[in-house]
Regions:
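Charged, terminal alpha-helix-loop-beta segments
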Residues: 1-114, 118-174
Length: 174
């Protein structure tokens, strides 16, 4: 059994764009993190974004899986993927821009486009007032992190992928 609650605090909760968009266990962690409740509970009061309303703060949504039906095209072929399972490693949201992440360990030469396209299409089809969706691959090696960003110029076309930018962060151990 859990121990009794030692303290109760009323917390001003302001719903954000993707809060409660899915009902996964990781989403509630995301909401608690984005509302800075996790920080308050573990570390005490958070002053980093004290002067910004919660809607203006960057938000993190942890890994989750969901199922949905996706409709799109590849070259001239129409595709309907019924009850398609989608796994999203991480989602960031800031000012109506959503960045989805697919993370891999090791050195890869290429990737499966579906790993970023299906999450892209999931958010694109959500009817949420999003301004932009950025798809990111993160490759982790022993001493570096490599990031690659893409989007889709024609959201309903799998083959409209567009490279945006890349950057490697070399991790220096001091």
């Amino acid at each position: 059994t859990f121990e009794p609650i030692q303290e109760r605090t009323e917390w001003a909760y302001k719903k954000s764009l993707l809060n409660e968009y899915n009902d996964s266990e990781s989403n509630i962690l995301s909401v608690a993190n984005n509302q800075r409740i996790l920080h308050d509970f573990v570390f005490g009061r958070d002053l980093e974004f004290e002067n910004l309303p919660i809607q203006k703060r960057p938000k993190t949504y942890f890994p989750h899986r969901t199922k949905t039906t996706l409709r799109y095209s590849f070259e001239n072929e129409q595709i309907i993927a019924l009850n398609q399972q989608i796994e999203i490693d991480l989602t960031l949201e800031f000012n109506a821009v959503v960045a989805i992440f697919e993370a891999k360990n090791g050195t890869l030469k290429d990737f499966n486009i579906y790993q970023i396209y299906h999450p892209f299409l999931y958010y694109y089809s959500s009817n949420l007032p999003l301004q932009n969706i950025i798809c990111c691959y993160l490759l982790r090696n022993e001493n570096s992190l490599k990031f690659f960003a893409y989007t889709f110029e024609k959201p309903l076309q799998l083959d409209s992928i567009k490279f945006l930018k890349s950057k490697e962060y070399i991790l220096r151990k001091d």
